[in-house]
Design a protein with these regions (language model features):
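N-terminal Rossmann/SDR dinucleotide-binding element
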Residues: 1-77, 196
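Rossmann-fold NAD(P)-dependent oxidoreductase module
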Residues: 15, 19, 111, 160, ...
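C-terminal substrate-binding subdomain of Rossmann-fold SDR/epimerase-dehydratase oxidoreductases
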Residues: 203, 209-337
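Acidic/polar helix N-cap motif
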Residues: 60-61, 93, 305, 320
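N-terminal Rossmann-like NAD(P) cofactor-binding module of classical short-chain dehydrogenase/reductase
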Residues: 76-79, 121
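Conserved NAD(P)H cofactor-binding loop of Rossmann-fold oxidoreductase domains
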Residues: 82-85, 124
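Catalytic helix-loop patch of NAD(P)-dependent Rossmann-fold dehydrogenases
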Residues: 92-95, 99-107, 119, 128-174, ...
């Protein structure tokens, strides 16, 4: 079976490519390299012994997307990661997010609808829930008004897919991630932000390694036990394995609806300060940090109820927060050595 992975050299994408190849899939990767590098291919090869087929392609270029699918008519499924993904940046540059995250999806769906049957796994986000009215978050909670343009693009993306599946032969699984962290245990691939990191853990590890003087903690006045925001931090390898299970479900026609939705998290919320303490424990060092104002678009807390994924997919996150932080630290040390 051949699977296309868009954004397949990115953080989650590269780990998913590894798991797909480990399960025997033929993988084709496209990426525009805007937030990653070709060196990731070497890491994938080091882990799996195989380099996936790769094309540099910007999914905002409709003609190039059309040409790609003309040349790859034997693709059985698509896992669509390619997107801009930072809440804060999306507030500052919303049009970039609508262009990257909506146009690319539409162009892919336009090509998939030409096929007699097509399957897509969509990289969605817990941001679609906004500040949910109850915790933990279940899939049947109503989607709230988005707190950021990034979150809005994920809501719109889900709606576009749902509308499209009603009138085409496309089947879809929407995977709502919570907060992916960590790296492959081999430290051959990991999170590699170009420029200033947009996520907490790379900021922590870069501060720990000495690239940054101190970590900025955005807000300590949230209504949480220690005042800092709470998120559900899931090891990226656990997340990647869920994608393999999801694509197998579609390819084996085990899906029970044209569109299925699953939360992917650990089911446990951790505050920013708890993540810092986990890093300090695994690294053996004290992390310098300062409290600064909240970021626009950030919510108080979000953690998953994963019963549906556990029961229907037979998937459950395995790694602890400390294990994820240890793998992230191992990766940071390797790339700076």
């Amino acid at each position: 079976m051949k699977v296309l992975v868009t954004g397949g050299l990115g953080f989650i994408g590269s780990h998913t490519v590894v798991e797909l190849q480990n399960e025997g899939f033929e993988v084709v990767v496209i990426d525009n390299l805007s937030n990653t590098s070709l060196a990731v291919l070497d890491g994938i090869q080091a882990i799996t012994g195989k380099v996936p087929a790769f094309e540099k392609l910007d999914l905002r270029d409709k003609e190039k997307v059309q040409d790609f699918f003309r040349r790859h008519q034997d693709i059985d499924g698509v896992i669509h990661f390619a997107a801009s993904k930072a809440v804060g940046e999306s507030v500052e540059n919303p049009l970039l997010y609508y262009e990257n995250n909506i146009n690319a999806l539409v162009y892919i769906l336009q090509e998939l609808q030409k096929k007699s049957t097509a399957n897509i796994i969509f990289s969605s986000s817990c941001t679609v829930y906004g500040q949910a009215e109850k915790m933990p978050i279940t899939e049947d909670l109503s989607v709230q008004t988005a707190m950021s343009p990034y979150g809005n693009t994920k809501q719109i993306g889900e709606e576009i897919i749902a509308d499209t599946t009603k009138v085409t032969n496309i089947n879809a699984i929407l995977l709502r991630y919570f907060n992916p962290i960590g790296s492959h245990p081999s430290a051959e691939i990991g999170e590699l932000p170009l420029g200033v990191p947009q996520n907490l853990v790379p900021f922590i590890t870069q501060t720990g390694i000495g690239l940054r003087q101190e970590l900025s903690v955005y807000g300590d006045d949230y209504p949480t036990p220690d005042g800092t925001a709470i998120r559900d931090y899931i090891h990226v390898v656990d997340l990647a394995k869920a994608h393999v299970i999801a694509v197998q479900r579609l390819l084996n026609k085990k899906n029970q609806a044209k569109v299925e939705t699953f939360n992917l998290g650990t089911g446990t919320g951790s505050s920013v300060l708890e993540v810092i303490r986990a890093f300090e424990k695994v690294s053996g060092q004290k992390l310098p940090y300062k409290i600064v104002a909240r970021r626009e678009g950030d919510i108080t807390e979000a953690y998953a109820n994963t019963d549906k994924a556990n029961t229907v997919l037979g998937w459950k996150a395995q790694s602890t927060l400390e294990e994820a932080m240890a793998s992230a630290w191992k990766w940071e040390q390797k790339i700076r050595s």
